[in-house]
From Swiss-Prot:
Cysteine disulfide partners in this protein: none
Role noted for this protein: GTPase-activating protein (GAP) for ADP ribosylation factor (ARF).
Encoding gene, per UniProt annotation: AGD14
Organism: Arabidopsis thaliana (Mouse-ear cress)
Chain coiled-coil ranges: none
Protein name per Swiss-Prot or TrEMBL: Probable ADP-ribosylation factor GTPase-activating protein AGD14
GO terms of molecular function: GTPase activator activity; zinc ion binding
Superkingdom in the source lineage: Eukaryota
Amino acid sequence: MMGSKREEERNEKIIRGLMKLPPNRRCINCNSLGPQYVCTTFWTFVCMACSGIHREFTHRVKSVSMSKFTSKEVEVLQNGGNQRAREIYLKNWDHQRQRLPENSNAERVREFIKNVYVQKKYAGANDADKPSKDSQDHVSSEDMTRRANSYHSYSQSPPYDYQYEERRYGKIPLGFTGKSASVKGLHAKASSFVYSPGRFSDHMFEDQFSNEDSAPRASDYSVSSAGDPFRSDIQSPNFQQEAEFRSPQFQHSNAPPSENLFPGRQHQRTTSSGSVRSVDSNFMSIKSYTSGGLGEAVSESRQNTGSQQGKTSNHVPLVAESTKAPIDLFQLPGAPVAQSVDTFQPSIAPRSPPVNLQQAPQTYSFTPANSFAGNLGQQPTSRPSELSAPKNEGWASFDNPMPAAKSTNVITSPGDFQLELKIEEILQPSTSMQLPPYPSTVDQHALSIPSPWQEDLSNVLKDVVDNPQPWNAFPDSIEANPLDSSRNIHQQVDGASTSSYNTDHQHLESQVLEELSNDGTQTTRIPAGSSAFGFPGNIGMAPSYSEEAWQHVNEQKSANPFDLPYDSEFDSNDMFLDMSSLQGALPDIQTPQAFLNGVSQPWLAADSVPSYLPAPAVAQGGLAYMAGQASTNSAAQGPVAFTGGNPFA
């Protein structure tokens, strides 16, 4: 380190001495004073401006103050310089006629350097005086070698064998670093054998099975003086002699040469045959290294591979026999295995039939409550499907049939097409809405309806078809009392029920009960066990009202005395809305005739109190309001009439 620094200082002193020489005091290109750069391509002293232009032409330039020169470069520079370069490159240059360019004009300097050093226009024909063709080549080659060494000094990678062994068996011990690459690989392998028997077994098995079809790797048997590394023998019986030839430290002898590696392990002379014959454990014991050496251990391991393969083949059926059904860790011991229930495909002999939510019961093929409609012409099966109806009150069910005590199927067969109508019964008011756990279904064959029943049904349907009259919800006439229509319906009910009861009382029993309720409403109730001759059970009869019931329809009175009274006429005994006392207290004011000229006579009511709604109008919702009707609860008060509902207006 100190020598190189002293050499650099000495070289710099020599170069500065060369700069003081008269030919080197000025730049060779522009003749400027004090050049500070050296063009090592032509070994000339140039100024800073010319050095930049030289770099444009890829000429090498060094700074005297900032760069370091080697001893060779200093020697070549002593033999060269500006004077020597003028003799070579400016030999035909006429100094009286031609002037050197100024450094301020870069174009002329660039043209000068191109003509002199690149095109060599002013060089002489005799090149024998060229100073340093050989010296320049020598310096260039030396410089390239030096730069290559400095570049690869810390980046050289080890040979492939050593690199492979280091990657496979770990770092190499420090004692083996001073040897060649092949010896390093062998010692790395041997050291890995000694330190880790498990890795040795892995290596032995890998060498045994990897060399069956191809040649062994050159890195495994790479020795500088060994035989052919690309042998194709499978078991490699000569591996012991090769190991003896490669490493004299591990020769086959009874004397333990491994004392240097294991200085305190001579007492461990245990013979462990199980460790040699077992595949899972370490392949060799320390005794095999200390007593017999590496070659003996390798031969013993080679001899035991055949028997080991036989033993492992004997153990394979035991493993195959012991393999049973896999144990489910999530299954509790003794817990029954739950079978997966497929709701779309019936299982084979299930313990409990699954509920099919996609197919409706076949006996109720024409039930309108079924949201998943089935086929109309589907025949009833020989065995009815079992349904588990929930025991919840008030819940709607789509697939389950409507609750009924008995159900009947009416079959009308025009040709091959069969239409099944389910006639359900109307529950009594005292019947609860709880569904039975197992609803009764019809038998395999549908019930046959007697002829009178069918005749009544056909007559009713024919009347409906023949008389397609629209339903008039708002009749125009006030006297159109629905009592007559209700009486007609009662007569039809009586006649139909009597005929059906007399014809076949075993299948259908109907009884019409007419009762007068507390509010005077006459209702018709069909008890359980009967049906309304062909009509579905969910069709109820409209209640019929008697003549006395019109008086008690609206018994509720408004709490506001200024509202229009809608009570019936006989409620005038109630003094809450009676205006007779108020009207009697008011003075009798006669309206002048002048105020009555533009008013028609119907607007002058005989009563100051607004008229009441009649009973039929009240029953019909108050739609037909007759303003011209006068009440008889008070005497006439003359032609005076209050047009508003407020008596104080």
